[in-house]
């Protein structure tokens, strides 16, 4: 089963590279495979020096590869679960982005459907919020895909620089949710919110986000003279997107004070919760 997961990723990577080559976006198949693997693994690295000149179809495909890779190949689960029976538990362990201590529901197939349903619902909700906040539908769809996957591909050369505070806060909230253990989101979705909130992992995750946000906010306000409102928004946005390895940027934080940069560096390694779409050590 572990071999099946590995072979599936390889096959998806090789096939997913074809749109880049067939559309002429990339001349090299090797570059196309790199871009696809970067998307499916939500790494976020790219071979494109600029992306704004790319056709909408290619931009959408880039974002879609990250969204598909964000929760693993749950579609594959839905197809294989009935045939694999109890063996599917081991497949989920091989594919899931974090440790699984127990089954969320008695049947693994039902678990996969529920988790994927939560993933889709949050993605659609973010699309709607971003559209209301002023983004075009195309931009809202692409950034919702890559936010929930914590991948960070953007359709803009400058990522999300120049975005309104409303857009930044929406991205911040959904990046935070994407960094939460999906088993806790499952509990919340099934009416067990109090049980989810009692999770020690969630408390530590939230404490780190809030604490680092406040520290960076104070640092920006005192050392860099950034206005209070702007410092709060920038600090929260970069803290969450960096910790969850979403990787969006609205400012050049390389110019921030040393303390801020060191704090963000540590967060990159920390990552979000186990069982989330985020990267890092979790």
Where are these regions (language model features)?
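Membrane-proximal intracellular helices of multi-pass ion channels
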Residues: 2-282
């Amino acid at each position: 089963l572990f071999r099946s997961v590995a072979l599936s990723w390889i096959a998806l990577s090789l096939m997913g590279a074809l749109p880049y080559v067939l559309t002429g976006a990339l001349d090299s198949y090797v570059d196309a495979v790199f871009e696809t693997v970067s998307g499916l693994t939500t790494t976020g690295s790219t071979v494109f020096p600029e992306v704004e000149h790319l056709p909408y179809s290619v931009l959408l495909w880039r974002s879609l590869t990250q969204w598909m890779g964000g929760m693993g190949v749950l579609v594959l689960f839905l197809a294989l679960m009935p045939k694999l029976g109890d063996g599917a538990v081991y497949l989920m362990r091989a594919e899931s982005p974090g440790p699984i201590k127990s089954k969320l529901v008695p049947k693994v197939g039902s678990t996969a459907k529920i988790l994927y349903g939560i993933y889709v619902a949050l993605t659609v909700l973010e699309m709607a919020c971003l559209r209301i906040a002023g983004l075009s539908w195309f931009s809202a769809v692409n950034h919702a895909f890559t936010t929930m996957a914590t991948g960070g591909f953007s359709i803009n050369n400058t990522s999300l620089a120049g975005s309104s505070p409303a857009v930044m806060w929406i991205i911040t909230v959904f990046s935070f949710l994407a960094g939460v253990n999906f088993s806790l989101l499952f509990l919340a979705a099934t009416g067990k919110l109090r049980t989810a909130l009692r999770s020690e992992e969630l408390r530590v995750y939230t404490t780190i986000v809030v604490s680092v946000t406040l520290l960076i906010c104070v640092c920006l306000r005192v050392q860099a003279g950034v206005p209070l409102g702007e410092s709060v928004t920038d600090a929260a946005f970069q803290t969450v997107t960096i910790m969850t390895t979403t990787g969006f940027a609205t400012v050049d934080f390389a110019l921030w004070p040393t303390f801020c940069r060191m704090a963000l560096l540590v967060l990159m390694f920390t990552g979000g919760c186990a069982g989330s779409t985020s990267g890092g050590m979790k």
